A protein has these predicted regions:
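Acidic/histidine-enriched alpha-helical segments
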Residues: 99-105, 157-175, 186, 240, ...
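His/Glu-based metal-binding/catalytic segments typifying zinc-dependent metallopeptidases
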Residues: 260-327, 360
Length: 404
C-alpha cells in the first residue's frame, strides 16, 4: 500500500530536480518569523502575538484548545461540541443576564457579528474559538476581547438553565446534520478503526447523551480538559505587540495551572494485514460512492518545521494536483467512467495519528466497479510512469496563483 504514495512522490521528484538539493539538508529547521512574539506563562499557556498593518485598525483573536471529541468518555459523547456552544451562553465577565450583556450581544454592539466574526468549531482533536475583524480604535474593545479569551479558557458559567436551553439547539443541529452520508460515515468508523478510540468519536455525538446528560458531566469535561497547558492564544493585527503582551499576562494571571492533570493522549491507529472493507447503504444516498485509503504513519510534529517536510508537502501537493487533473479530464470525456473522482493526501479520515492517500469516486447506479477500477489504474499509472513536464508546469502555476 505504501509503495503507491512513494511512487507518486518519486514521480514528482524526477521533474523537480532542484528539490534534490533542498533535501540534502533534511533536518534543517525553518526560522521562526522574528516578528512573532512567542511566550509561555507560568501556568503553561502559550501565546503568539504579531503586528500586521493590513487591514488597518483591525485585529484577530484566537484561542485554540488541544482537545476535542476524541477525549470524551462514553457518557460524554457530544459534550465537547456542546461545551463550545455553552461558551457563548454566559461567562464570568459576560454573564448574559440582568447583571450584564453576554458575549454575543456585546460583540454585536461593536460590529462583531456572530457566525461571521465571532465563531468556533469543534473537531476530533481540537476546539478553536475566534473573534475576527475587531476594530482597534477603541482600546476598551480590544481589552474586552482579551477578557472573552480569558473566560473561554477558564470561566464559562455552565448554568443549569442555560444547559437545558442549549439541549434544544443541539438537537436541531443534530437533526439538520443527520444526513444519509453522515449516517454511513458514522457507521463506517468501527470498520475503519477497529478496537480504537476513533471508532466512535464524531463531534456531533449521541442524541441520547445530549438529551439526558447530568449537568456535572459537562462541568467535569470542562475542568479536566480546558486548561492552560493545552491552550494557545493567537493575536494578529494592527496592534502594539508590547502592550498586548503585557495586558495578556495580566488578564491570564489568575488562570491556575492544573494539579495532577490528566494525560492528553494521542490515540494510535493500528496497521492491518488485510484490507478493511465497509459497505453501507442508506435510503437517502441514491448513487454509489467509493473511498479507498492507503494508510501510513503520520509525520511527527517534531519534523514539521524542517525544510524536508515542506519540500515533501510541496511535492505531494503537486502529485495530487496532477493526478486530479487527469481524473478531471476523464470526467469530461464523452463516456466518463465516473461522475466524480478525486485524490487527496492528509489525515486518515478522522485520525491525526495516521495519514493516508485517499482515492474517491462516485458513479451512476451500475457504474461503481468501473469507477473504482479507473481511479486505481490512474494512480498506478502515475506511480509507474510519472508525470510530464508540461503537467508539472500547469500544476506549479496553479500552486503559485493560489499562494499569491
Amino acid at each position: 500500500m505504501k509503495h503507491l504514495l512513494r511512487g507518486l512522490f518519486i514521480a514528482v521528484l524526477f521533474i523537480c530536480c532542484n528539490f534534490q538539493l533542498v533535501l540534502a539538508q533534511p533536518m534543517q529547521e525553518l526560522p521562526v518569523d522574528k516578528n512573532v512574539r512567542i511566550g509561555k506563562l507560568d501556568n503553561g499557556l502559550t501565546y503568539y502575538i504579531r503586528h500586521n498593518a493590513l487591514p488597518e485598525k483591525r485585529v484577530e483573536f484566537y484561542i485554540a484548545q488541544k482537545v476535542g471529541s476524541i477525549l470524551e468518555e462514553p457518557q460524554q459523547r457530544g459534550l465537547a461540541h456542546f461545551l463550545e456552544h455553552m461558551a457563548f451562553n454566559g461567562t464570568k465577565h459576560f454573564p448574559g443576564d440582568e447583571t450584564g450583556l453576554g458575549i454575543v450581544p456585546w460583540c454585536e454592539t461593536k460590529g462583531i457579528k456572530f457566525g461571521t466574526n465571532l465563531n468556533a468549531y469543534t473537531s476530533v482533536d481540537q476546539t478553536v474559538y475566534n473573534i475576527s475583524n475587531v476594530p482597534t480604535e477603541n482600546i476598551n474593545v480590544v481589552d474586552s476581547c482579551l477578557l472573552i479569551l480569558h473566560d473561554w479558557s477558564s470561566a464559562i458559567n455552565l448554568a443549569d438553565k442555560e444547559i437545558d436551553k442549549e439541549r434544544g439547539v443541539i438537537r436541531e443541529e443534530w437533526r439538520s446534520r443527520n444526513s444519509g452520508m453522515l449516517r454511513i460515515m458514522t457507521d463506517a468508523q468501527s470498520t475503519l478503526y477497529p478496537d480504537s478510540k476513533y471508532s466512535d468519536c464524531m463531534p456531533i455525538g449521541s442524541i441520547d447523551v445530549i438529551n439526558n446528560f447530568p449537568y456535572q458531566d459537562i462541568r467535569d469535561y470542562y475542568a479536566k480538559w480546558y486548561r492552560p497547558d493545552l491552550q494557545g492564544i493567537v493575536i494578529v493585527g494592527d496592534i502594539n505587540v508590547d502592550e498586548i503582551e503585557a495586558k495578556l499576562k495580566k488578564v491570564f494571571a489568575d488562570v491556575k495551572a492544573p494539579v495532577n492533570p490528566a494525560e492528553r493522549i494521542y490515540y494510535p491507529v493500528a496497521d492491518n494485514q488485510e484490507p478493511l472493507i465497509y459497505i453501507g447503504t442508506d435510503k437517502e444516498v441514491k448513487n454509489p460512492y467509493v473511498n479507498i485509503f492507503f494508510k501510513q504513519d503520520a509525520t511527527p510534529d517534531s519534523l514539521k518545521n524542517t525544510i524536508a517536510y515542506y519540500a515533501t508537502q510541496y511535492m505531494v501537493s503537486m502529485a495530487m494536483n496532477m493526478l486530479n487533473n487527469r481524473l478531471n479530464e476523464l470526467r469530461q470525456t464523452a463516456n466518463p467512467p465516473f461522475t466524480s473522482a478525486s485524490a487527496e493526501y492528509g489525515n486518515y479520515f478522522l485520525a491525526k495519528t495516521k495519514e493516508a492517500l485517499a482515492l474517491d469516486a462516485s458513479s451512476k447506479i451500475d457504474g461503481i466497479d468501473l469507477a473504482m477500477k479507473t481511479v486505481l489504474e490512474e494512480a498506478e499509472r502515475a506511480r509507474r510512469f510519472g508525470f510530464t513536464a508540461s503537467e508539472y508546469e500547469r500544476a506549479r502555476a496553479n500552486y503559485l496563483q493560489a499562494v499569491e
